[in-house]
Amino acid sequence: VSALFDNAAGLSPRARVTLSGVTIGEVTAVSIDQQTLMAKVDMAIDSQVDYLSLDTSASILTAGLLGEKYIGLSIGADEETLNDGAIIEDTQSALVIEELVGQVLLNLGGG
C-alpha cells in the first residue's frame, strides 16, 4: 500500500505504521511520485490486517513534541478494502515544527 503526501518531512524507511495506536506495519520507501511530484510513501502492512477500507486515510504524526515521525491510518466506512498496490489519497502531511514555531512567533510579535 502507498500514500501520496504534499510533505513527508522527517519520515524515513522503517518508520512504524499504526492503526488505533497499534503498530501494523512499517514504511518501506519514501520517494517522489513521477506523475504527481508528491511524496510517495510505500508501506508494508502485516498480512493479518486485511480490513483497510477504500476510504482509509493516512496521516504523518510525531511521537511527542520532537519525537519520531510515523504513519497513522484511520479506517473509513467503505465496505470494499484496499488491494496490494493501492494508493491512499486521503492524507494529512507532516506538521513541520519549525513552521509552526515560526507562525507562533510571528503571531506573538503582533502579526
Identify the residue ranges that each predicted region occupies.
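Extracytoplasmic/periplasmic terminal helices and flexible tails
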Residues: 9-13, 28, 37-40, 46-47, ...
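Short extracytoplasmic
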Residues: 4-36
